[in-house]
Amino acid sequence: MRLIIATCAVDYVGRLEAHLPRADRLIMVKADGAVSIHADDRAYKPLNWMTPPCTTTEYRRAEALAEATDGKDPFLTLPELEDEDVEALWVVENPKGEQLRIQLFAVHSDQNFDLGEDPGLQKDGVEAHLQELLAEQIEILGEGYSLVRREYPTPIGPVDILTKDATGATVAVEIKRRGNIDGVEQLTRYVELLNRDELLAPVTGVFAAQEIKPQARTLAEDRGIRCVTLDYAAMRGTDDSEFRLF
């Protein structure tokens, strides 16, 4: 884990465009390559981020000037370095060509920490039981769904449930008692990873929970992830309510 406190400006270039003007912020770089930009508010939510797989390349203004030859403009391809106040430019790019372009004006703190391997979030009793019940009642997800397996292993952790829909397409299911943004991010990583497997692709995601926070639902829908609200009592057979599908 690398934590940098810096005066920076950030531009996101991709499906949309977004700009963060010059200010002091926290830049977090994780061991898996993820980069996120944080302000001193908004709780845990970053201002902008890039999830793995992605690459980060650093360009320094002094080096660009030193390498310039034959009168060529050293800033032709890196216009952000033209500002004399900029010390460096980070270009964080994913395979889709989306970029975070981070101008560093001053670095106030730069620290690295080895956190080791995390044991992962342990599901509580309700989540574990929801997974078991949904595997037994997989038709809740839709007519024609069939179970592939529970706890489908991946290099970044097990997918709660892997299924096939009525067309035979692969669907990864993440189950939570309370669905928040972290759960959507987790499922996004699983879907991106599974889509690299030609035997499974194309893979879509379903985010299933007893309760799904509005922000999590918005993020999921923006990423093409379907949300399903689960009625725990009905699934256990202690309630006659119909399952709610959104």
Swiss-Prot record:
Gene3D superfamilies: 2.70.180.20, 3.40.1350.10. CDD domains: NucS-like (cd22341). GO terms for molecular function: DNA binding; single-stranded DNA endodeoxyribonuclease activity. It comes from the Bacteria. One of its GO terms (cellular component) is cytoplasm. Its EC number is 3.1.-.-. It holds the Pfam family NucS_C. The keyword Methyltransferase does not apply. It is found in: Cytoplasm. Keywords: Cytoplasm, DNA-binding, Endonuclease, Hydrolase, Nuclease. It is an enzyme of class 3 (hydrolase). Its main location: cytoplasm. Belongs to the NucS endonuclease family. NCBIfam families: PRK03298.1 (NF002876). Cleaves both 3' and 5' ssDNA extremities of branched DNA structures. This is Endonuclease NucS. It comes from Corynebacterium urealyticum (strain ATCC 43042 / DSM 7109).
